[in-house]
């Protein structure tokens, strides 16, 4: 179809893809079960109390900046590939990457600058380092979203599944190492290391998916449009944003 084929994208098929996502999610959850209980050994109840304040605003900002966009990008890429509009699919990925990247920078900076205020409002001014540790993760998550959406739109679920596992491994290993190393120095630094584990995990997941993208260059040959198909490449930025 318009130069696009399942062989070109090495599609793994819906069933296999679903199994990969399920397996990745399961492994990620199993690893996560041990994270908090082990961290509690050096942190204690007081340290864990400082871990929680940054999480609520962090999750709220992620919900505003990126939740659902992974699915939206995936759906639109899949739709354009199905009709042979490879140029349109490429534009969806590029525009979403640009918009998400800009949004990620803005929200990360806002989160970092507001960190002392958010910590004071929640009654834990000593948790400010934890807020700062999470700020870069917002940008990295938004960058990762469009690439994961690209691969899921191509019915390639392995990158998404592997990303989940890599993120959780990084979170647990680096986070716990930081907790055990920094808690003896200062309790709030140990708590911040717990939060920083999340950022490191997201960073490793982003590195992996970027590596896969640079290795495969999946959009390299997305230069054609099937006869009779109106390409989304011709849509204005505003029109395409409304679709996303």
Put a short name on every predicted segment:
Residues 52-77, 139-140:
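Small-residue-rich midsections of specific transmembrane alpha-helices
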Residues 157-158, 169-215:
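Membrane-interface helix-loop junctions in multi-pass transport and translocation proteins
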Residues 1-33, 91, 231-244:
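N-terminal membrane topogenesis motif
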Residues 106-128:
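Short membrane-interface helical motifs at transmembrane helix boundaries
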Residues 39-60, 187, 191-195, 236-243:
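Interfacial/gating helices of multi-pass transporter permease domains
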Residues 124-147:
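Alpha-helical transmembrane segments of multi-pass membrane proteins
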Residues 15, 52, 87-102, 241:
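Interfacial transmembrane-helix starts/ends
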Residues 142-163:
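Membrane-interface junctions at transmembrane-helix termini in multi-pass inner-membrane proteins
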């Amino acid at each position: 179809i318009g130069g696009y084929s399942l062989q070109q994208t090495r599609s793994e098929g819906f069933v296999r893809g679903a199994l990969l996502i399920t397996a990745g999610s399961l492994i990620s959850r199993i690893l996560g079960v041990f994270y908090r209980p082990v961290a509690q050994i050096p942190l204690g109840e007081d340290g864990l109390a400082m871990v929680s304040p940054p999480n609520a605003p962090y999750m709220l900002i992620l919900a505003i900046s990126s939740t659902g966009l992974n699915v939206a990008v995936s759906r639109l890429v899949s739709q354009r590939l199905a009709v042979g509009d490879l140029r349109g699919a490429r534009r969806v990925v590029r525009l979403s990457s640009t918009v998400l990247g800009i949004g990620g920078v803005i929200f990360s900076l806002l989160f970092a600058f507001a960190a002392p205020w958010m910590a004071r409002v929640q009654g834990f001014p000593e948790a400010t380092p934890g807020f700062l540790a999470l700020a870069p993760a917002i940008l990295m998550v938004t960058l990762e979203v469009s690439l994961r959406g690209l691969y899921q739109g191509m019915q390639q679920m392995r990158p998404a599944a592997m990303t989940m596992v890599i993120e959780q491994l990084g979170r647990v290993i680096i986070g716990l190492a930081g907790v055990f190393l920094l808690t003896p120095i200062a309790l709030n630094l140990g708590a911040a290391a717990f939060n920083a584990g999340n950022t490191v995990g997201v960073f490793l997941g982003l590195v992996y998916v970027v590596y896969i993208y640079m290795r495969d260059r999946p959009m390299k040959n997305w230069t054609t449009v099937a006869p009779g198909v109106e390409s989304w490449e011709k849509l204005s930025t505003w029109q395409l944003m409304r679709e996303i």
